């Protein structure tokens, strides 16, 4: 595990990418990157630091850059979503794919979009899925 602060330029570039890709709505004083290796792949977790809190913002999986679910649930970013009913919730939490019968609401999205899976009652994100 390796932690470091991003330079001002690196932080600015990352925040611009998050604003463009995921509609980030909050500024941060600093960005920390945590680097680790998981199953022979280098993973980076970007953490936003403000005067009051530290929030995981995004995860760089080398082939894919995704928002952190915690940041989505704090409404710091916006992505397309599907809401699922309570009957589908345990299956999704155990790794099942999202199927049409469990979907009760959707936003506009296209094939190959990254879509957040939200539970219907509290509207919290529980998973991310790439549509194919």
What are these regions (language model features)?
Residues 1-132:
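Accessory RNA 3′-end/elbow-binding domains used by RNA modification enzymes
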């Amino acid at each position: 595990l390796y932690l470091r602060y991003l330079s001002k330029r690196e932080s600015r570039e990352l925040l611009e990418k998050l604003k463009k890709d995921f509609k980030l709505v909050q500024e941060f004083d600093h960005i920390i990157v945590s680097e680790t290796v998981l199953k022979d792949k280098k993973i980076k977790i970007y953490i936003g630091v403000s005067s009051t809190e530290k929030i995981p913002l995004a995860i760089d999986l080398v082939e894919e850059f995704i928002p952190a679910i915690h940041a989505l649930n704090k409404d710091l970013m916006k992505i397309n979503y599907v809401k699922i009913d309570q009957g589908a919730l345990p299956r999704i939490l155990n790794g099942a794919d999202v199927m049409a019968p469990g979907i009760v609401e959707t936003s506009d999205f296209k094939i190959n979009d990254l879509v957040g899976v939200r539970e219907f009652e509290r509207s919290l994100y529980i998973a991310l899925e790439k549509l194919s």
